[in-house]
Amino acid sequence: MSLIIPPKYKLKLLPETTEMAIKMLKDAFQERLSKTLNLRRVTAPLFVLSGTGLNDDLNGSERAVSFPIADMGGRQAEVVHSLAKWKRVKLGAYDIAPGFGLYTDMNAIRTHEELDNLHSLYVDQWDWEKTITREDRNVEYLKKTVKSIYKVIKESESLIYAEFPHITPTLPDEITFIHTEELLQEYPRLSPKEREAAVARRYGAVFLIGIGQQLSDGTRHDGRAPDYDDWTTPN
């Protein structure tokens, strides 16, 4: 576990005020995200039955927390890692038209995480999925969507600043797009995580493209799911 607490660190908000700020931020963000991307809210499962294929295998090596269900003959259930597959099933089940989608507040447990300031065993994250046409399956549409989400993030940051002026905004006006091969060429002596940290310090907000495919040095920037991530769209 790698937890770093800066010397003489002081909380900017009292614990109870922090909870109020978290609620304000989550409420504002989900409302804006829903309107911006045409998403409807759905309730997410905390666990799914084993063997259904609905749990996200992530990189294919992580083990899910599981338990038997007594009233179902001991069938195994798994706490979700993420909802990547489940969301796509729901898009079909709800017959959601192109240009519209769903979002949920996902809670999960990931026992394999390397614990630090940013990673925990407990995951609480916004998860969303949208139906698109074949024509929209391209990098330009991806970038357009990312810019829309970033705009929501910036608006949420401004809202918090208006309520708590001592929490000053830090995000740049625009998000920077960069391919992982570009990162490799620019920082060949650094590890993938170190490259991410370096480019984030440089630009302030970055969206990485091409994470799972093989790079020119024969390595991958990071692992990606073998059974549902997009490996074919040219990028």
Functional labels for PLM-detected ranges:
Residues 2-235:
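Structured aminoacyl-transfer and RNA-binding surfaces used for tRNA recognition/handling
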